[in-house]
Structure formats: C-alpha cells, structure tokens
C-alpha cells in the first residue's frame, strides 16, 4: 500500500501541490456550473414555486399554453427527426467522398452556429415569403411557409441541423470500411449492411445528435419569432409565449410556462440518455 511517509520532502511537496491544483480545479468547475447553470435554473424554480398549486396548474394548463407546448414539442421533434435522416446522409457524404467544394460544404454546416438567429429568421422569411425566391413558387402550389407552422419547423431545422452532422462525423471517420466490404463479399445487400453492420455503432451517436437537435429546437426564439405568425392556437411556440408574457408584465405566467418547458426538456433528455446507456450496454 502506498505510504506518503515514505516520500522525501520534495516528493511530498509535489504531491501536496498536485492535490491543491486538483482541489482548485474542482472548486472552479463547481463555481462555474453554479453561476452559469444551477443558480439560473434554481431562481426560475424558486420564482415559480411562489405560486400556489392551483394557480400553477391553472397557468400551466391554460389553453393557449397547452397549444404552445404542443406546437413547440411537435415541431421540434419533426425537425430533429428530419435532421437525423438528412444529417446522416450529409455526414456520410462529407466523410466518405471527395468532391470539389467538399470543404466549403463542410464549413457551411457550421453556419447556424455563427449566424445570429434573428438574421436566420429574416433570411428564411425573405426567401420563403410569398414574394421570395422559393415562396413565390410554393405560393403557386397553394403552399405557404412563412408566417405559418411550416415556417416554425423550417427555422428549427435550420438552427438544429449542425448538431446531428457534427455528432455523426467522428463516428463515421472511425468506422473501418473493411467491415462493409466484408459484408458485401458475404452477399449482404446494401440495406442489410447498413442495418446490421453500420447502424449499431451509429445508433448512440445518432440518438445523441437528435437529442441535441431537439433541445436546440425547443429553445429557439430569435428566428421563429420572425418567420412565423406567432398566432395563438396556430403557430405560437412556448418561448415566444414566455416573451409575450414578459412584455405584458405577467412574470408569474412567464416563470410557470418556462418551468414547464424546462421540466419537459429535462425529462425527455433523461429518457434519451437512459436509452443511449441501454444501447451501449446492449452493444457491449
């Protein structure tokens, strides 16, 4: 067994210094988490807990709030699933193929990270409005995107897209092509090769990317408020409803609705993390 007394004074000084550095690192980490994450969430929960149970339930289950939850969660889920499919395709192309403009396309994937969400919303509204480049053509087909629920999903697609691609790329880069070639040589079809050889190692990363995309879409405000009509019971989402409550100085309503969205998001993320852990155990 290791005995600190067996060390000379110089070694004990080094060991003591390392322990202090570790302690300081832990203290700084906890302080950062406390200030940036735990305190704001705690303040929100504390503010909403000041309401009585009946008042909390009344505000949280108001028809306009229930509609906003439904629009937010359903639109975010559809956007995340679509990004899961097309994000996988784009990540596959970027990793497995060389073509002119590949680096430019790879850099463009990160554009939603750098672009202000208000600029993204303005761009989408300009392009998909009735007088926009694409909106004009869609209008001839009686399809309206801007200032509708489709606009909400489009904005969520835009801001959450990079999460899936960037989560899948490292996994695809680490996968050996020899596994695919071996499956093909044994007579497996491309579909069976994907389903039995590629899908198992990709599934945890895919679910992580979809979860991150969903979380990002649920919290989106800047682009949605511009590209949607923000009409209750139609395309009003929870973050915009919270802001409307703040504009009306209804702080109780804003905190209660914010708490509900927070709890829903945390519950879904915990469920997804549990599924990921189960998949890892199943895959060994």
From Swiss-Prot:
Ranges for domain ABC transmembrane type-1: 69-272
Gene3D superfamilies attached to this UniProt entry: MetI-like
Disulfide topology: none
Pfam families found in the cross-reference section: BPD_transp_1
GO molecular function terms attached to this record: ABC-type sulfate transporter activity
Transmembrane regions listed in the UniProt entry: 25-45, 75-95, 107-127, 145-165, 194-214, 223-243, 255-275
Signal peptide (residue range): none
Keywords: Chloroplast, Membrane, Plastid, Sulfate transport, Transmembrane, Transmembrane helix, Transport
Record carries keyword Transferase: no
InterPro entries: CysT_permease (IPR011865), MetI-like (IPR000515), MetI-like_sf (IPR035906), Sulph_transpt2 (IPR005667)
Keyword Transport: yes
Predominant location: plastid
Topology relative to the membrane: Multi-pass membrane protein
CDD domains: TM_PBP2
Locations listed in the record: Plastid, Chloroplast membrane
GO-annotated cellular components: chloroplast membrane; plasma membrane
PANTHER family associated with the record: SULFATE TRANSPORT SYSTEM PERMEASE PROTEIN, SULFATE TRANSPORT SYSTEM PERMEASE PROTEIN CYST
Function: Part of the ABC transporter complex cysAWTP (TC 3.A.1.6.1) involved in sulfate/thiosulfate import. Probably responsible for the translocation of the substrate across the membrane.
UniProt-listed NCBIfam families: 3a0106s02 (TIGR00969), permease_CysT (TIGR02139)
Family: Belongs to the binding-protein-dependent transport system permease family. CysTW subfamily.
Name of the protein: Probable sulfate transport system permease protein cysT
Organism listed in the record: Nephroselmis olivacea (Green alga)
